[in-house]
Each structure stands twice: as C-alpha cells, then as structure tokens.
Design a protein with these regions (language model features):
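Glycine-rich, basic loop-to-helix element that forms the pyrophosphate-binding segment
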Residues: 72-88, 159, 163
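Catalytic donor/gating beta->alpha subdomain of glycosyltransferases that bind UDP-sugars
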Residues: 187-250
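Short aromatic/hydrophobic "clamp" motif used to bind/position activated sugar donors
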Residues: 93
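Conserved donor NDP-sugar-binding/catalytic core segment of glycosyltransferases
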Residues: 105-141, 216, 220
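A conserved acidic beta->alpha catalytic loop
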Residues: 36, 51-59, 100
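Short, acidic, metal-binding catalytic loop of nucleotide-sugar glycosyltransferases
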Residues: 35-44
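N-proximal low-complexity "stem/linker" segments adjacent to membrane-targeting elements
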Residues: 1-36
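A recurrent flexible, glycine/aromatic-enriched loop bordering the glycosyltransferase active site
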Residues: 152-175, 190-191, 197, 217, ...
Length: 370
C-alpha cells in the first residue's frame, strides 16, 4: 500500500486520513471492498467499519484486513456514522459503502484536492461495476437517464476536473473532520437521504462542495425487480421526509413523482373505460370523448417511452448498449412507480409525525449474508 506522497496540511504535516464504512450483514461484499482498499496507491490511512450488530462474519472480515471494527448499536446509516465519527480523530474522512469495488487510486484521487483550503468536501460519480449482471446494468442506465431522474446525483458527470456541486452521494465522498464537527456530524435519527442532509448542513455553515468527475466509484446496483423497486421506494420515502425538515434539498420533481402512481391508475381506468364505452374499438370516432379516453393516455405513454429511450441513449451510464437502452423505459417506469409509492408513504408519515427525524424506518432492499 502506498505509491504516492501524502498530502500535507498548511503546517507541513500529513493529513490523517480515515475511511468510514457502515455495514450490516454484508460480509462477503465487504471483503471485496477491504481487499481493494488495502492495495491503494495512497500510503497512510485507517479503515473503520461501523458494524450495526451483524450476525454474519463481518467482524472477522474487518479484522482480517486490518480494519478498525466498531460495534455500533444504531439502526440507520446516519447514527452508525455518528457513533464512529465521535471515536475518530482524523483530519479527513472518506465515506463509501460495503458493496463497492474501489479503484486502487480512489483514496489518492479524493485526498489530493484537500491541498486547496477552499475545498470543504469532494466526491465523484458512481456507476455499476462491469461485473454486475445485465439487469443491474439496466438499472444503472435508468439511474443515469437524462430528463427523468428527479435530480438524482447518481451518474452525475459534469465537464471539468473539479466542479462545484450541491451534493455528492455518500458512497464516494470525503469531508474535512473540522467541518463535520462544526455541523455536529449527520442529523441524528435521519432514516435516509442522510448524505444529502449532511451536505446541506455543510453548505449552511459556509463550506464548499466539489465533484471530481474522473474519480468514479463502481457501486453495485440492485437487481430487478423486487430489490430494485424496494430501493426506489425507500429513496422516495426517506427523501420526502428529509425534505420536510430541510427545504433547501427539496426538488419539485420529488413531489411530482408522488402523483405518478395515481396518474397511471387514472390512465388505465380511462383506457379501459373508453374501450368499454367505444365497443372495444380503438378507431371508432363516433363518440370523440370515448376515442380520446383511449388515445390521449396511449399517446402520452408513447411519448414517455420515447423520452426514456432518448434519455437513456444520451445519459452518462458507461453500460449503455442496444439492450440496456431498449429496456430503459421499463426500468424508468418501475423506478417512477416505486419512488412515487415511497413519496405517498412519506406524505402519510409527515401527516402523522411532521417528518420528525428518528421516526419511521428505512425499507431494507439488500440481500444480506445473515
């Protein structure tokens, strides 16, 4: 481990670097992450595993690779990270997940930017790894589709070497510990979108966030169909609840997608009703209302499919192919449907609790080892 020189602070001493990975019952994939991290080009850093009471061999995997293992009592990613951060004394904290495949120069490419004092945090894009199956690559293409992704930062790859940005996903980012302490780390009890909320807190404090478009983290996508849709449902649910507390992270598109399932149900009822009333003919124009009840939803569906194809074809996913682009409308539709369900669940939660942090629970979309 170590082929490059350490980045120095203003006082001439090296930054003390820590990599924090929250994990629960995912030892086999964590093993791959840690194996890659032990081969990094950057010479000195500590790996910390915040283990939320795993029932598998997570501890053994962590210790095998020389990582610091912390048994964490939390039940969400924000609190797990906070528990570990309160025990850490590093200058820089890098974050990733336990289902990534870190490039061997990942640490080097993140840490180098902190030689510039104006950089408060930096991150990079994430795409599905080449090892992912076809269905997961279809999900990646859907994540990175233009026009239809509700402002998600997954797959964001702007032009430039270091570009200002308002958010980096927690799977591929680094922060100054001083800034994290200043904002009291993650929002306690945040059940999801905790990385978005953290970046909002960092920016409220006056610090700047950047993205290095070339520092890509391969991140496994959920496979179709149940895990993929559960993930989308969780995104819609947790993001809308967080939006209630943090208005600056809210996008109008998040709310619009909440109406998507209702729109689909209405469109289906319109088509079925039109067919029934029009004697099951799609071309009979004797009653223009019945005709339009069939053809307006049908025309909108065709437009939706074509827009998804176009967005997928010009999106940022490296896994665009004839096959993955062809299936993009299906995966985009499933994402919108499930995300919309999550938004509706969030609206119910907000009516019940006001969106208070610590209420509710994430939807677990992972296949785990225990």
């Amino acid at each position: 481990m170590g082929e490059v020189e350490q980045v120095l602070k203003e006082d001439g001493t090296p930054y003390k670097v820590g990599i924090l990975i929250p994990s629960i019952n995912n030892a086999d994939e964590l093993d791959i992450v840690l194996e890659r991290l032990t081969k990094q080009t950057y010479p000195e850093f500590e790996i910390i595993i915040a283990d939320s009471k795993s029932q598998d061999h997570t501890k053994e995997v962590a210790l095998k690779h020389g990582a610091t293992w912390i048994e964490d009592p939390s039940r969400n990613r924000a609190d797990a990270c906070n528990y570990a951060l309160n025990m850490m004394d590093h200058d820089l904290v890098l974050f990733t997940d336990d289902d990534t495949i870190p490039p061997l120069d990942w640490v080097e490419k993140l840490v180098r930017w902190f030689s510039d004092p104006k950089v408060g945090a930096v991150g990079g894009p994430n795409f599905a790894p080449d090892e992912d199956p076809f269905g997961a690559k279809c999900a990646d293409v859907a994540f990175c589709t233009k026009f239809m992704t509700a402002g998600t930062r997954y797959g964001a790859k702007p032009k430039g070497t270091l570009v200002p940005i308002h958010h980096n996903p927690g799977v591929n980012c680094a922060h100054r510990m001083a800034n994290l302490r200043e904002v009291n780390f993650f929002e306690p009890g945040c059940i999801g979108a905790e990385d978005v909320v953290l970046d909002a807190k960092i920016q409220r404090a006056g610090h700047k966030i950047f993205i290095d478009p070339n520092n890509i983290m391969p991140h496994r996508r959920r496979r179709p169909f149940k895990p993929y849709m559960k993930q989308m449902r969780n995104y819609g649910y947790t993001r809308m609840v967080a939006n209630k507390r943090w208005p600056e992270i809210s996008e109008k598109s998040h709310t619009v997608i909440g109406f998507f399932p209702w729109l689909i149900v209405g469109a289906l009822l319109s088509v079925l009703g039109g067919l029934y009333l029009n004697e099951f003919s799609i071309w009979n124009q004797e009653n223009i209302l019945y005709y339009l009840m069939i053809h307006i939803p049908g025309g909108l569906a065709i437009f939706y499919i074509c827009l998804a194809w176009l967005g997928a074809a010009i999106g940022t996913s490296p896994h665009r192919s004839i096959g993955t682009v062809f299936f993009a409308p299906l995966f985009v539709f499933l994402a919108h449907w499930a995300y919309g369900q999550g938004v509706n669940k969030a609206w119910a939660e907000i009516r019940r609790t006001g969106g208070k942090a610590g209420e509710g629970a994430q939807i677990d979309d992972r296949v785990r080892t225990a």
